[in-house]
Amino acid sequence: MSRYRGPRLRIIRRLGELPGFTSKTTTRTSSPGQHGGSNFAKSSAYGIRLQEKQKLRFNYGITERQLLSYVKKAKRMKGSTGEVLLQLLEMRLDNVVFRLGMAPTVVAARQLISHGHIVVNDQKVTIPSYACQVKDVISVRAKNNSRKMVTEANSTATANVPSHLSWNKESLVGVVNKVIDRKDVGLQLNELLVVEYYSR
């Protein structure tokens, strides 16, 4: 399944606030569609699990295949599968760039990385799914256009940098200090329902 490229407000009306997906908000409380969406998806156990799974997909900008791969990897690792899954997604380079305020959304962060504007430990990295590690240093290439794009994005960033990261606004350098705590994940969802969805 490919990444979503349709209207973003339609998605957040259905799933709620998704900071990595869009900074836009909506005042409409009904689900999209002529009759406000189907009640089946809201009330059935399957529908609720599907909705939580979709929150992860859209917020982190990943495909169904990628999410399934992360779930399988989380199951092989120590700890709560749901919490480990969130940690794996949060440590993706595109998400770290977004959480540092270097880009307004995960999609924008992915473009920065793909176009060669981001450096990790003094090496240019162009793979958005690159798994960041503790003590990784994320910075901007020493090119005027690269620094300008990040500076502009950072000046309009509204979210605070989470405690597992640190950010120097003057030098445009960020550091991964530790693995993220569950309370710092900027998304309202029940990750256990996502694990249950893939355990069917």
From Swiss-Prot:
InterPro entries: Ribosomal_uS4, Ribosomal_uS4_bac-type, Ribosomal_uS4_CS, Ribosomal_uS4_N, S4_RNA-bd, S4_RNA-bd_sf. Gene3D superfamilies: Ribosomal Protein S4 Delta 41, Chain A, domain 1, RNA-binding S4 domain. GO terms for biological process: ribosomal small subunit biogenesis; translation. This is Small ribosomal subunit protein uS4c. Its main location: plastid. One of its GO terms (molecular function) is structural constituent of ribosome. It comes from Oltmannsiellopsis viridis (Marine flagellate). Residues 91-154 form the S4 RNA-binding domain. PANTHER family: 30S 40S RIBOSOMAL PROTEIN (PTHR11831), SMALL RIBOSOMAL SUBUNIT PROTEIN US4M (PTHR11831:SF4). GO terms for cellular component: chloroplast; small ribosomal subunit. It comes from the Eukaryota. Part of the 30S ribosomal subunit. Contacts protein S5. The interaction surface between S4 and S5 is involved in control of translational fidelity. Keywords: Chloroplast, Plastid, Ribonucleoprotein, Ribosomal protein, RNA-binding, rRNA-binding. CDD domains: S4. It is found in: Plastid, Chloroplast. Belongs to the universal ribosomal protein uS4 family. One of the primary rRNA binding proteins, it binds directly to 16S rRNA where it nucleates assembly of the body of the 30S subunit. With S5 and S12 plays an important role in translational accuracy. SUPFAM superfamilies: Alpha-L RNA-binding motif.
